[in-house]
């Protein structure tokens, strides 16, 4: 009986300890920032405002100061001020715009010595944002010549199965494809539904960076034969030391600045041509269904998805998320943001060894906005207003140029990332495009 009593007492003590250490279901200081227009879109000349609702331990904040700064997208602040919480709410008025674009507000407040921060952007007539980049008269001729030359280079494909990365549903292989010129290779992962059937094919180009890429089997799980590629000539089995060496070789990773002096030698020429070579490979596969070809990616991958769809008529649809490389001359026009890598952005420390005019002449042949003008197939496009990597001003300028059928999924609160729900809608849309 005594042992039973002691055991019961011990169990009760443990229960008490666990109850005392139950993690909170929300932070002690909890706040949300809400634009005065529910869709975060304003007409030109409208006054933009944010409502900040904050609680600490379930009680509304009182007499706590909110500091804020505001300005045009990715530009220095032109407005600053303070407001005070009353009954858990503070209203921050942060100005307007008289030209189409985006405006940000950065705010902060302190509770018990802890600083809480948020940044939010709102749009002003975003559908009216127009390009700053020139549209060269010989743009199409330049790319036709480039692709004609690149097509003469044999593919010389090597495929190495990777059973350790495969599953009963998806077969994964390492791929090496010669592209653009002899000795230049694209490396990637081929992921195939492991069912012996024929399937649509999907090209999946990468985000920016000289880095290791990983397989993306989820597209194959959705029924797409997928080629996930790198663009910087790094084999999938490269060592960390080899990747570091490649980073140093490619301007410490800033490869977007290589070859700005001339459109014929700019770094992205072989990258863009390589996208078409990847489609050559995909449509040659025996389990390709012979009909459906898609491309999808985010950031640099979103940019390359637009480029591929514009250059290769075999592509039937694309899904592009917050594309980089859009309207690259934006920062040269004063209060206007340009796309990643944000040439001439305020505070940029990159050395540019050519004239600004020459740089933008070169870039006009590579600006994704000029490829967006030439899209002829349906597209799914998605971005968020709070993106500081690929500013929404640049993304919106490019998407506005697309005249082909398009679905635009805007999630104002997202930044350089997207919600799982957005992915689900994009995947469903891509499946629906397949015949």
Predicted regions and their residues:
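N-terminal cap/lid segment of alpha/beta-hydrolase-fold proteins
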Residues: 36-38, 151-196
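Hydrolase active-site cap/lid region
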Residues: 302, 306-354, 410, 418-421
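Gly/Ser-rich "nucleophile elbow"/oxyanion-hole loop immediately N-terminal to the catalytic nucleophile
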Residues: 254-299
């Amino acid at each position: 009986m005594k042992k039973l009593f002691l055991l019961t007492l011990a169990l009760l003590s443990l229960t008490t300890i666990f109850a005392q250490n139950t993690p909170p279901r929300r932070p002690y200081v909890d706040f949300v920032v809400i634009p005065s227009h529910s869709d975060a879109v304003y007409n030109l000349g409208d006054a933009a405002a944010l409502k900040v609702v904050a609680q600490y331990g379930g009680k509304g904040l009182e007499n706590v100061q909110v500091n804020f700064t505001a300005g045009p997208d990715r530009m220095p602040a032109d407005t600053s001020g303070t407001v005070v919480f009353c009954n858990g709410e503070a209203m921050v008025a942060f100005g307007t715009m008289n030209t189409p674009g985006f405006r940000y507000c950065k705010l902060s407040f302190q509770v018990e010595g802890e600083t809480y921060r948020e940044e939010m952007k709102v749009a002003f007539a975003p559908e009216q944002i127009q390009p700053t980049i020139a549209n060269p008269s010989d743009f199409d001729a330049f790319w036709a010549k480039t692709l004609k030359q690149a097509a003469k280079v044999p593919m010389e494909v090597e495929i190495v199965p990777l059973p350790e990365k495969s599953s009963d549903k998806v077969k994964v292989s390492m791929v090496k494809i010669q592209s653009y010129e002899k000795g230049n290779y694209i490396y990637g992962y081929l992921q195939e539904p492991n069912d012996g059937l024929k399937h649509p094919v999907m090209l999946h180009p990468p985000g920016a960076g000289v880095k290791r890429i990983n397989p993306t089997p989820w597209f194959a799980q959705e029924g797409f034969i997928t080629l996930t590629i790198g663009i910087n000539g790094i084999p999938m089995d490269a060592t960390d030391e080899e990747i570091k060496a490649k980073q140093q070789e490619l301007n410490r990773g800033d490869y977007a600045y290589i070859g700005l002096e001339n459109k014929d030698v700019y770094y992205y020429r072989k990258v863009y041509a390589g996208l078409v070579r990847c489609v050559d490979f995909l449509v040659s596969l025996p389990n390709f269904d012979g009909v459906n070809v898609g491309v999808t990616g985010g950031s640099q991958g979103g940019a390359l998805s637009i480029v591929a769809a514009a250059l290769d008529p075999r592509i039937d649809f694309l899904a592009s998320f917050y594309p980089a490389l859009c309207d690259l001359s934006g920062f040269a026009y004063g209060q206007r943001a340009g796309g990643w890598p944000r040439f001439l952005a305020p505070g940029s420390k990159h050395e540019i060894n050519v004239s600004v005019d020459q740089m933008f002449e070169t870039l006009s042949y590579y600006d994704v906005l000029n490829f967006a003008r030439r899209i002829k197939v349906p597209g799914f496009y998605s971005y968020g207003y709070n993106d500081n990597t690929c500013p929404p001003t640049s993304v919106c300028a490019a998407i506005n140029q697309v005249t082909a059928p398009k679905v635009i999924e805007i999630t104002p609160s997202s930044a350089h990332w997207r919600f799982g729900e957005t992915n689900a809608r994009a995947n469903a849309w891509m499946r629906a495009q397949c015949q």
